[in-house]
Amino acid sequence: MEVIGKSKAKAIIESHLNDSVIYFSDHVRILKHNPYCTSVSYLKDHGVYQWVFQVNDPRENPITAVFFVEQNEEHIDLNGNTPAGPLSSEEPLPPGTLSGKCIRWVNSPKVPDVELKEKHTFVGQANTRICLYHLDDQRTEVHFETDITLDFELSFPLNMMPENILKFMTEAIMSKIMQQATESMLCQVQSDICCSGAELTASGCKI
């Protein structure tokens, strides 16, 4: 059964763009702020990062989700629009943008041949776009959005239920998990680089 989860976040941080880029380019550091992420590692031989997440199904049975992603960076064209992301199309740049950079975590087109040790382990797909906009007063506006897709099998007796009901239940849980993870990561960003709480918003949604 395939389920999809999505989340969006925006924040104004009291940090110069150059410092913000260094912070958000630290792939391992950012992912370790996610309370459901148990491991992040760079597979040098394959040129990809491996994420390992641990969640529970509706009956509290553990599920291990593994993702393989590549990290890319690109400059934002001030004469153009915000680069399209996994959840949104191109849109105008935030008012007052002086410069910007976009960091992407893109699902690897090829799954590396690595051993998956945990039981009930499933390989998913993940795509993230982090846009960083340099504003005045040494501030950076951050637009963070991500979506994940996971195709997995549920244990008995859940697998005896109608799939449409299972899908609804599972995606509701996925939505809750991603909302909690987004809020947790934003709180950690706030702690690390003095994020302005009054200008921080987060939202999660499901399909």
Language-model segment annotations:
Residues 57-71, 132-134, 191-206:
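A broadly tuned preference for mixed-charge, low-complexity surface segments
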Residues 158-207:
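A conserved amphipathic terminal alpha-helix motif
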